[in-house]
Amino acid sequence: MPTIQQLVRAQRKRIVKKTKSPALCACPQRRGVCTRVYTTTPKKPNSALRKVARVRLSSGFEVTAYIPGIGHNLQEHSVVLIRGGRVKDLPGVRYHIVRGTLDTAGVKERKQSRSKYGVKRVTKK
């Protein structure tokens, strides 16, 4: 506990909160252009080919973003929307691509959790 004289001499330092998604620049989402679409392997003990894209954002950053869902239509020069959210078993992947917006199509034949994958409700006839 500092004395009053110590507080007069030097004010208390504020704790600076570091953001987990700096490329978004305090925005909920950002638009970007895919520069490379590829697959990568996760950390141990998992094994898969995870679909990711290197995206140049409108904020000037170039980030790696995960493509969620089964199948996608992304290729180089596709315009995508990026949101925050890391992928635990892919080091360096701190962003997700939003499905069903801009050039990204929604997941085909998705019945549950549709809003997360950009799928409209199917109407029964």
Swiss-Prot record:
Gene Ontology terms, MF aspect: rRNA binding; structural constituent of ribosome
Pfam families, per database record: Ribosom_S12_S23
Matches recorded under CDD domains: Ribosomal_S12
One of the protein's GO biological processes: translation
Main location: plastid
Keyword terms: Chloroplast, Plastid, Ribonucleoprotein, Ribosomal protein, RNA-binding, rRNA-binding
Lineage: superkingdom: Eukaryota
Subcellular location: Plastid, Chloroplast
InterPro entries: NA-bd_OB-fold (IPR012340), Ribosomal_uS12 (IPR006032), Ribosomal_uS12_bac (IPR005679)
A GO cellular component entry from the record: chloroplast
Function as written in the Swiss-Prot or TrEMBL entry: With S4 and S5 plays an important role in translational accuracy. Located at the interface of the 30S and 50S subunits.
Family designation: Belongs to the universal ribosomal protein uS12 family.
HAMAP family with a match to the protein in the record: Ribosomal_uS12_B (MF_00403_B)
Subunit and partners: Part of the 30S ribosomal subunit.
Name under which the protein is recorded: Small ribosomal subunit protein uS12c
